[in-house]
């Protein structure tokens, strides 16, 4: 539903040359928005082949005409009014009144125009409105965010930290927040996989890729794996990246896909031998409830593999948010953790720490250079007073159920 609404808005708003490029991908479509939304809801080979062409086009647009491209959380982009209209419909009357008072405008069109031109107002909006979205609103927005990239995050940390372990594991694994399903594909070479995600568009993508891999499809599937590798960029050379040929040649185990939230899993107690949850926890409404569910469905001795952004990742995020004036938290990161808070949350729910590894490092000089651009001067002074050699923006951790 939200995708068709978005494409209707988008195709009516972009310039003629850009619209022509989108029409060329589906030359026979009479209702272009409905046709695009339909293809994003399907899990067949034709839909995946279309998505590859779509992402090739959108990547070019981001480079050549960023104001016309599909971008989330960018105030000078053509999609910005759509997100404002959506938020205006779902927030409370009290929140609408606060926005009217802060902007000095009554109409959402005028409010949107004020937000586009006023950095301070956008920062206020993010802090007062955009940072308190409901879980359902996050799920819906993620349907559109999924249009920006084919992959869904977590591929690098999976390949670097989890993939070497998976090759020695047995049993059933839960891919919690599976996204476009890259980790699912790889893990299914060794384990029975149950994959859950709340984003229907990405889940359909994962289902299609799994089906293509099982059938040994050799035309489109290798293009998909190549695209994921390209989206990883230089990070792909820092870890063992399985080739499409290896995945197609392997014997895939059973994979089951479920659309839903990982804070309410449809599995019995002690069902899984391991859980993979990468680049997910920070996007959720209540991380502790998710850890409780993991404890319920995991066998004693089973392990959870998890990544999460750190306190310094939060600082970097807040700096960029204040510089750009985003109306939502950057990347929709709602939570950040340090080793103590992450481990404490798992220990409260019956886990013990196996390892916590910081990664994604930035030198202190680079970090401070970013901070200097921020309007938040108090933050800059606080950082100057407590220098480090380098900072880690993310954590990889393994916890074992007692």
Where are these regions (language model features)?
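Core SAM-dependent methyltransferase catalytic element
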Residues: 373-402
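A short glycine-rich, Lys/Arg-flanked "PGG" loop and its adjoining helix->strand segment in the class I
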Residues: 288-300
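Conserved N-terminal segment of class I S-adenosyl-L-methionine
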Residues: 2-264, 291, 321, 392-395
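Conserved class I S-adenosyl-L-methionine
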Residues: 305-327
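A conserved beta-strand element that flanks and buttresses the S-adenosyl-L-methionine
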Residues: 276
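Short catalytic micro-motifs in class I SAM-dependent methyltransferases
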Residues: 279-280
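Acceptor-substrate binding/catalytic loop of class I
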Residues: 325-341
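Conserved catalytic loop of SAM-dependent methyltransferase domains
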Residues: 354-378, 390
């Amino acid at each position: 539903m939200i995708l068709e609404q978005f494409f209707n808005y988008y195709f009516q708003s972009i310039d003629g040359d850009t619209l022509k490029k989108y029409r060329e991908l589906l030359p026979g479509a009479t209702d272009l928005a409905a046709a695009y939304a339909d293809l994003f809801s399907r899990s067949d080979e034709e839909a995946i082949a279309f998505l590859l062409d779509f992402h090739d086009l959108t990547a070019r647009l981001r480079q050549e005409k960023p104001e016309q491209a599909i971008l989330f959380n960018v105030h000078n982009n053509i999609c910005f009014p759509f997100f404002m209209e959506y938020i205006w419909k779902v927030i409370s009357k009290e929140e609408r009144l606060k926005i009217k008072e802060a902007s000095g405008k009554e109409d959402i069109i005028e409010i949107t125009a004020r937000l586009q031109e006023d950095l301070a107002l956008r920062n206020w909006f993010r802090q007062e409105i955009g940072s308190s979205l409901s879980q359902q609103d996050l799920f819906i927005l993620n349907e559109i965010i999924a249009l920006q990239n084919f992959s869904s995050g977590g591929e690098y940390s999976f390949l670097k930290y989890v993939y070497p372990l998976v090759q020695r594991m047995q049993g059933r694994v839960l891919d919690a927040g599976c996204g476009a399903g890259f980790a699912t594909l790889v893990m299914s070479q060794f384990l029975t996989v149950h994959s859950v995600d709340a984003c229907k568009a990405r889940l359909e993508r994962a289902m299609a890729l799994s089906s293509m891999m099982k059938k040994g499809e050799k035309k489109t599937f290798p293009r998909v794996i190549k695209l994921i590798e390209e989206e990883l960029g230089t990070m792909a050379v820092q870890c063992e990246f399985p080739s499409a040929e290896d995945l197609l040649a392997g014997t895939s185990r059973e994979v089951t896909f479920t659309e839903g939230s990982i804070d309410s899993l449809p599995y019995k107690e002690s069902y899984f031998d391991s859980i993979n949850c990468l680049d997910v926890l920070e996007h959720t409404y209540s991380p502790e409830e998710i850890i409780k569910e993991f404890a319920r469905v995991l066998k004693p001795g089973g392990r959870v593999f998890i990544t999460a952004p750190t306190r310094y990742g939060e600082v970097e995020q807040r700096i960029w948010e204040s510089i750009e004036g985003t109306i939502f938290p950057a990347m929709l990161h709602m939570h950040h953790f340090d080793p103590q808070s992450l481990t404490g949350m798992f220990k409260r729910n019956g886990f013990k720490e196996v390892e916590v590894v910081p990664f994604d490092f930035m030198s202190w000089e680079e970090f401070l250079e970013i901070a200097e651009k921020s309007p938040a001067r108090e933050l800059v002074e606080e950082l100057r007073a407590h220098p480090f050699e380098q900072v880690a923006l993310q954590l990889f951790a393994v916890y074992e159920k007692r």
